[in-house]
Amino acid sequence: MAACVDKWPAAYPCRLPDKFYCALPDCTTTDRPVAPAPAASGSSGDYVWDALRAEAQDDADDEPLLRKFYHDLVLSRPSLESALASLLAAKLCIPGALPQDQLRDLLAGALAAHPEAGRAARADLAAARDRDPACAKMVHCFLYYRGFLALQAHRAAHALWSDNRRAPALLLQSRASEVFGVDIHPGARIGGGILLDHATGVVIGETAVVGYGVSILHAVTLGGTGKESGDRHPKVGDGVLIGAGASVLGNVHIGDGAEIGAGAIVLRDVADGTTAKPIIGKKAEPQRELPGVTMEQRWSD
């Protein structure tokens, strides 16, 4: 079993394709030209971080009560990765058992060793801003959205897992599950531009793969069937939308641009650009757009 699990990631390498990262000036994994962000006084050259800091400053100026809060968690930090490590450490530490400063150093080290995690976090912030009508500012997602925070905890845990540091990776998984109510195994491979909307009750298994530009609502399970070992979890393509309460079980493939209806139980492959309905016996219907990006949930008669 261990050998099988260790071999499968080679078929699903971590990658940052240009179609979901072309708006991020700091993405260096594609040859596609990227228009630079407009220059601004005090700009770091990191578009997402600069925008997030500007939003934080606006909120701090408008609400004096929040000035220290925003200063400590955002405005005093030199980078998105630094701010993220500090914020997650504050939420995941255990007083008297898991010191906040040591946890911050662990998270910061994992993010520094795996810069792809930081690029994915930036794409996740942009996804929340663009797809969630309740998200007025990226800084609100960064500070308050449990789905985003749980996903970034997973990215750090996955970095540690990839470096064969299994014990601290499992520690982060456990704490994220306890604090955020989201359980993602550190072995799972998740692309960028992900929206975990509401997120409570999301479970993603060890050998699951999630593509790019995917939107997942609350109470979704990407799990095994309980009868298999090795590579036993779903493979979700790009631009997929998975509705609330859906369960995708086993080593099945969900094609690019597919939609899994709320409450659906999926036990077999779903073709590209089709909808898997929650009603047993209904055939998958074709989709015209990427539901994971448009966030439209539609079922034809």
Curated annotation (Swiss-Prot):
<dbReference type="InterPro" id="IPR042122">
    <property type="entry name" value="Ser_AcTrfase_N_sf"/>
</dbReference>
<comment type="pathway">
    <text>Amino-acid biosynthesis; L-cysteine biosynthesis; L-cysteine from L-serine: step 1/2.</text>
</comment>
<dbReference type="InterPro" id="IPR053376">
    <property type="entry name" value="Serine_acetyltransferase"/>
</dbReference>
<dbReference type="InterPro" id="IPR011004">
    <property type="entry name" value="Trimer_LpxA-like_sf"/>
</dbReference>
<dbReference type="GO" id="GO:0009001">
    <property type="term" value="F:serine O-acetyltransferase activity"/>
</dbReference>
<dbReference type="InterPro" id="IPR010493">
    <property type="entry name" value="Ser_AcTrfase_N"/>
</dbReference>
<comment type="similarity">
    <text>Belongs to the transferase hexapeptide repeat family.</text>
</comment>
<dbReference type="InterPro" id="IPR045304">
    <property type="entry name" value="LbH_SAT"/>
</dbReference>
<keyword id="KW-0012">Acyltransferase</keyword>
<keyword id="KW-0808">Transferase</keyword>
<keyword id="KW-0028">Amino-acid biosynthesis</keyword>
<dbReference type="Pfam" id="PF00132">
    <property type="entry name" value="Hexapep"/>
</dbReference>
<protein>
    <recommendedName>
        <fullName>Probable serine acetyltransferase 3</fullName>
        <ecNumber>2.3.1.30</ecNumber>
    </recommendedName>
</protein>
<dbReference type="GO" id="GO:0006535">
    <property type="term" value="P:cysteine biosynthetic process from serine"/>
</dbReference>
<dbReference type="GO" id="GO:0005829">
    <property type="term" value="C:cytosol"/>
</dbReference>
<dbReference type="InterPro" id="IPR001451">
    <property type="entry name" value="Hexapep"/>
</dbReference>
<comment type="subunit">
    <text>Homomultimer.</text>
</comment>
<dbReference type="InterPro" id="IPR018357">
    <property type="entry name" value="Hexapep_transf_CS"/>
</dbReference>
<feature type="region of interest" description="Disordered">
    <location>
        <begin position="280"/>
        <end position="301"/>
    </location>
</feature>
<dbReference type="Pfam" id="PF06426">
    <property type="entry name" value="SATase_N"/>
</dbReference>
